[in-house]
């Protein structure tokens, strides 16, 4: 099932048409195809329901989920270096002279092309959820680079995608710091036992607290000394636990058992019905969480 593990959240900066029927055709033009013999990497769209459906989009209640797959050829540097050195040595022996740097650089490209067809592939998939009701796009990944790559693929598929990272009116780290300092988060949220604190100075230290009482004197002292909270583990209404980061991303989402088991009455053999029910449940909960979070963090920055 598609329960998201992380959320990189983006705001559509202006209204655009995002209808699943249109998107289906647009994504099909950039459907995933495997790497050819000389490709280092390929990225494209695959059905979010895997082998259970050919559709590249799945939609329910104005929520759309899509899935990008990436194939990357793995060529370890030592392998390239060894093959290159062997080729250079062979040519220098044959020609009885030292090769120039430009010649060596050209040889490196030749070596890469000769090794590529034999290289192993690494595959990864990234889910993306488009909330057309609230004008948000969420990417299930932990790095901004991966999220931007997936958004770039969608932008290329649609022709236009005006999005910006979701940002708050007040710096997130200052709000998180105040929550820890006061020992109380915004309504609906509860502090857990994990945080990261950073000094505002460039060469200042980083403190990572795990399984620790965040209201303790030790943590308070770090804040008084000028450190700010850049990551904070939170519980939302005893339904979802996550780590809030100062860049606006949510990491390590953990849905409570009660939530995950809510659709257990649906026959697991009926994959499509279960997928649909879980998708509706997950997006409904996460949309409410995001809205609560925006309010709790002091509101979204004016655009």
Swiss-Prot record:
Any signal peptide, and if so, which residues? none
* Keyword set includes Magnesium: no
At the top level, the lineage of the source is Bacteria
Q: Name one GO molecular function term.
A: double-stranded DNA binding
Q: Main localisation, per the record?
A: cytoplasm
- Gene inactivation effect: A double deletion with priB is disadvantageous to cells, which accumulate DNA double-strand breaks.
Which compartments does it reside in? Answer: Cytoplasm, Nucleoid
Instruction: Report one GO cellular component.
Output: bacterial nucleoid
Q: Which InterPro entries does the record cross-reference, listed alphabetically?
A: RdgC
Q: Which UniProt keywords apply?
A: Cytoplasm, DNA recombination
From the record, give the cysteines joined by S-S bonds: none
Return any one Pfam family short name: RdgC
- Mind listing the GO biological process terms from this record? DNA recombination; regulation of DNA recombination
Protein's job:
May be involved in recombination. Genetic interactions among priB, dam, lexA, nagC, polA, rdgB, rdgB, rep and uup link the PriA-PriB replication restart pathway to DNA double-strand break repair.
Query: What family is it from?
Result: Belongs to the RdgC family.
The protein here is known as: Recombination-associated protein RdgC
- The species this protein belongs to is Escherichia coli (strain K12)
């Amino acid at each position: 099932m598609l329960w998201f593990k992380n959320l990189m959240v983006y705001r559509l900066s202006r209204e655009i048409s995002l209808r699943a029927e249109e998107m289906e055709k647009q994504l099909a033009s950039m459907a995933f195809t495997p790497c050819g013999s000389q490709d280092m990497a390929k990225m494209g769209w695959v059905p979010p329901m895997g082998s259970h459906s050919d559709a590249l989009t799945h939609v329910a209640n104005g929520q759309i989920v899509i899935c990008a797959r990436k194939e990357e050829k793995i060529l370890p540097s030592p392998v390239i270096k060894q093959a290159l050195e062997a080729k250079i040595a062979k040519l220098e022996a044959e020609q009885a002279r030292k090769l120039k740097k430009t010649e060596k650089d050209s040889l490196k490209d030749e070596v890469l092309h000769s090794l590529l067809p034999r290289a192993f592939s690494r595959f990864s998939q990234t889910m993306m959820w488009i909330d057309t009701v609230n004008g948000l796009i969420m990417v299930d990944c932990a790095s901004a680079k991966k999220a931007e790559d997936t958004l770039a693929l969608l932008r290329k598929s649609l022709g236009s995608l005006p999005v910006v990272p979701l940002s708050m009116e007040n710096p997130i780290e200052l709000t998180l710091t105040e929550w820890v300092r006061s020992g109380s988060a915004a309504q609906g949220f509860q502090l857990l036992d994990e945080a990261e604190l950073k000094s505002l100075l460039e060469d200042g230290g980083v403190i990572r607290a795990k399984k620790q009482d965040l209201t303790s004197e030790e943590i308070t002292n770090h804040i008084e000394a000028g450190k700010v909270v850049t990551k904070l583990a939170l519980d939302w209404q005893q339904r979802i636990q996550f780590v809030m980061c100062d860049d606006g991303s949510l990491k390590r989402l953990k849905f409570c058992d009660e939530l995950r088991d809510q659709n257990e009455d649906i026959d697991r053999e009926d994959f499509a019905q279960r997928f649909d029910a879980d998708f509706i449940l997950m997006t409904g909960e996460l949309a409410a969480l995001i809205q609560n979070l925006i309010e709790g963090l002091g509101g979204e920055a004016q655009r």
